């Protein structure tokens, strides 16, 4: 038996929610850093998916900071974006599987 959550809007069939990257967590950390008079550290903000991933397969950070972990991943030659040919300019990147070139 399904139980309805009154805090969640029921969507029409075929409609999915877009990930907000836990904007509430981002804002909370930004405000805290501003109050403390400092800049955010690399990896200080973690959406729920990143925090709960047991394999550390997800990375979140500031792509405008060339020294950040995410920036380095995005420059990796294995990085690609879905539907890149349509120039959608997504902020999510994927690393291809490492393949043995000599095989």
Predicted regions and their residues:
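Non-ligating segments of multi-cofactor redox enzymes
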Residues: 1-103
């Amino acid at each position: 038996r399904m139980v309805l959550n009154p805090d969640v809007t029921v969507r029409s069939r075929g409609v999915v929610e877009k990930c907000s990257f836990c904007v509430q967590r981002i804002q909370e950390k930004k405000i805290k850093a501003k109050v403390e008079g400092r800049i955010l550290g690399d990896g200080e903000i973690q959406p729920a998916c990143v925090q709960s991933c047991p394999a550390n397969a997800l990375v979140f950070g500031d792509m405008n900071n060339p020294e950040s972990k995410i920036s380095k991943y995005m420059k990796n030659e294995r990085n690609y974006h879905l539907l890149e040919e349509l120039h959608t300019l997504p902020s999510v990147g994927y690393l291809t599987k490492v393949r043995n070139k000599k095989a």
